[in-house]
């Protein structure tokens, strides 16, 4: 079939299959430290969750749990609406 995995005979010459390096599971910093809060009025906290292009960092990269990722997304969108965070990449943070 077309969707089968390649066997060792079908793999190109070059040795055995390479393994991915082990990465430790990221822990949600808001679950780990209960005193941290997510607030749209704190752009310095939210800055860690947006890229230099102004996009929201996904959960698999930031390590947040799904509940806190939703809160961060809402807070970033509110801060953008109030011009506390940049919408595009050519704006600078205060």
Swiss-Prot record:
The UniProt record lists the keyword Ribosomal protein: yes
Database matches in Pfam families: Ribosomal_S18
Ranges of biased composition (kind: Polar residues): 1-11
GO terms, biological process: translation
SUPFAM superfamilies associated with the record: Ribosomal protein S18
Keywords: Ribonucleoprotein, Ribosomal protein, RNA-binding, rRNA-binding
Keyword match DNA-binding: no
GO CC annotation, single: cytosolic small ribosomal subunit
GO molecular function, one term: small ribosomal subunit rRNA binding
Chain spans, region Disordered: 1-24
Recorded superkingdom: Bacteria
InterPro entries per UniProt: Ribosomal_bS18 (IPR001648), Ribosomal_bS18_CS (IPR018275), Ribosomal_bS18_sf (IPR036870)
NCBIfam families per the UniProt record, alphabetical: S18
Family: Belongs to the bacterial ribosomal protein bS18 family.
Assembly: Part of the 30S ribosomal subunit. Forms a tight heterodimer with protein bS6.
Role, per record: Binds as a heterodimer with protein bS6 to the central domain of the 16S rRNA, where it helps stabilize the platform of the 30S subunit.
Protein name: Small ribosomal subunit protein bS18
């Amino acid at each position: 079939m077309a969707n089968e995995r390649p066997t060792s005979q079908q793999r190109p010459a070059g040795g055995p299959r390479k393994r991915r390096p082990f990465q430790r599971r990221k822990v949600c910093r808001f679950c780990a430290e209960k005193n941290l809060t997510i607030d749209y009025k704190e752009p310095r906290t939210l800055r860690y969750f947006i890229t230099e292009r102004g996009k929201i960092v996904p959960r698999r990269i930031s390590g947040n749990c799904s509940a806190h990722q939703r809160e961060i997304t809402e807070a970033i969108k509110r801060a953008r609406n109030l011009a506390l965070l940049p919408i595009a990449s050519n704006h600078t943070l205060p």
